[in-house]
Structure formats: structure tokens, C-alpha cells
Design a protein with these regions (language model features):
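Short, low-complexity, intrinsically disordered N-terminal peptides in bacterial proteins
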Residues: 1-10
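C-terminal boundary and immediately downstream tail of ABC-type ATPase nucleotide-binding domains
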Residues: 2, 234-237, 243, 247-266
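ABC family nucleotide-binding domain
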Residues: 9-246
Length: 266
């Protein structure tokens, strides 16, 4: 392996260092440190209000951070380092540079947020055309490919109101993939679905993980965490209480707060 290849392999996909986030006086994230290796699936679990979703939103700068650093592929998110007078200063990136960073990170939300006046295919085509200036014919070809990938090749011209919740969420995943992200973030993607529709979305996510996509997933689906996750992070009160191999954490949690949480959900 070449030196450059070794360096690339050693670079975490996501590196979070001493991350703090406040909402007013509420200290939501309290010094988070986290490494997400390339091609891995990191699953975040914990009670409501523990900071899981806020952490996700800080990774792609939907929320600004108050202290600490977030790097994706070794590149600071939202900031650049400037050497001045023997010390390193952090300066905010331009809006254009921040948008370019954000375009590399796909995110799927609890609510599908599809455009109701657009078909499934049009929803998937929209961002590549507007943001990446992809020719319409190429965006359409890619959109069809992605909708077929998530099992919706027969729903291209359906509007969101004509789709089930699970189908809408699969369109949302295809829409995120249309930007060719290097990292995918999922914020409780199945929590708004009827129980019988959860499996179809989890299957798409499992297939995506098998393809080598780096994923950070907030979920209450412990079966998914066990079967697909490479590392499991339990958060409570804005801190990481426990982390490790999903099977080990789920079957033999070491922290009392982890044990209490798992006993309430398993």
C-alpha cells in the first residue's frame, strides 16, 4: 500500500473532538469525542433529550457548535485553521464553502420532507439539478437507478400522497443518495412509520451499509444495531456513557445508565 493510501486508510471518516453545544443555558452536548471509521456503521442510542439528534446535526452543520471540532475526511466542518502569531485561529468558512461541505453529507430525517407537488422521481432529481447543475437527462437516469435500488422502480411517477410512509422514506433515502454523499446520517428514520413498514426501510439501510457507505444512525431499532452496526454509542445527558461492539454493549452493558435504558427497551 502506498504512503498516500495508508494515510487515507488511517483518516477517520468522522472525527469529533471535545464537542460542546448549548441551547441558551442548556448544555446539550458536553465534550463529545467520537471516531467513525470509513465504511463503518455507527449507531447512536439513548433516551429522548440525550443529544443524539443534535450530535448528528452538528456533523453536517445544521447546528453550529459552541466549542470543539468536527472533521469529515480530515477536513474541518464549517471552519478553517489560520496560523497567526504562532497560534492557530479558527475562522468561519464562507457560505459557499460550507454548502460544498454539506453537499458531501447525506441526511435522512424522521419526517420524510418530500416535496408534495413533485413525483418520486422529481424529488430525487431536484437537488442534483439545482445544486450540482447536473443535466436533466443525466439526473433522470440516476434518479431512476436509485429508486430501483430502493425497490421503487414501479413508483417513479407517484406523488408522496400516493405512497406509504415506508415508500416515502425510501424516496427520501434515494434523494439523499442522488447527491453522491461520502457519509450518510439517519435521524430516527423509522420512528414515524407504522410497525409493518419499518422492515422495508431497515432493509434498504442494511443494503446501503453492505455497499460500504459510512453511516451514523440514530435509532431505537436494537435489532438493526445488533445486526448491522460496527459500533454502538449510548448517550445520556449530553455525554457518551458507553461505546463498543453492538453485541457486547447490548448483551453485557457495563454502565448502570446503559443497563437501565436497555432494560426499558429490550
Amino acid at each position: 500500500m502506498s504512503t498516500s493510501a495508508q494515510a487515507a486508510a488511517a483518516t477517520p471518516k468522522v472525527e469529533i473532538s471535545d464537542l460542546h453545544k448549548f441551547f441558551g443555558e442548556l448544555h446539550v452536548l458536553r465534550g463529545i469525542d467520537l471516531i467513525v471509521p470509513p465504511g463503518s456503521v455507527t449507531v447512536l442510542i439513548g433516551p429522548s433529550g440525550s443529544g443524539k439528534s443534535t450530535l448528528l446535526r452538528c456533523i453536517n452543520e445544521l447546528e453550529s457548535i459552541d466549542a470543539g471540532r468536527v472533521k469529515v475526511d480530515g477536513e474541518l466542518i464549517g471552519m478553517r485553521e489560520v496560523e497567526r502569531g504562532g497560534r492557530t485561529e479558527l475562522h468561519a468558512l464562507s457560505d459557499k464553502a460550507r454548502a460544498a461541505q454539506r453537499a458531501k453529507i447525506g441526511m435522512v430525517f424522521q419526517r420524510f420532507n418530500l416535496f408534495p407537488h413533485m413525483t418520486a422521481l422529481e424529488n430525487v432529481m431536484e437537488a442534483p439539478i439545482l445544486v450540482k447543475k447536473t443535466p436533466k437527462a443525466k439526473a433522470r437516469e440516476r434518479g431512476i437507478e436509485l429508486l430501483e435500488r430502493v425497490g421503487l422502480g414501479d413508483r417513479l411517477e407517484h406523488y408522496p400522497s400516493q405512497l406509504s410512509g415506508g415508500q416515502q422514506q425510501r424516496v427520501a433515502i434515494a434523494r439523499a443518495l442522488a447527491m453522491d454523499p461520502e457519509l450518510m446520517l439517519f435521524d430516527e428514520p423509522t420512528s414515524a412509520l407504522d410497525p409493518e413498514l419499518v422492515g422495508e426501510v431497515l432493509q434498504v439501510m442494511q443494503d446501503l451499509a453492505a455497499s460500504g457507505m459510512t453511516m451514523v444512525v440514530v435509532t431505537h431499532e436494537m435489532g438493526f444495531a445488533r445486526e448491522v452496526g460496527d459500533q454502538l454509542i449510548f448517550m445520556d445527558g449530553g455525554v457518551i456513557c458507553e461505546s463498543g461492539d453492538p453485541v457486547e454493549v447490548l448483551d453485557n452493558p457495563q454502565a448502570e445508565r446503559t443497563r437501565a435504558f436497555l432494560s426499558s427497551v429490550l
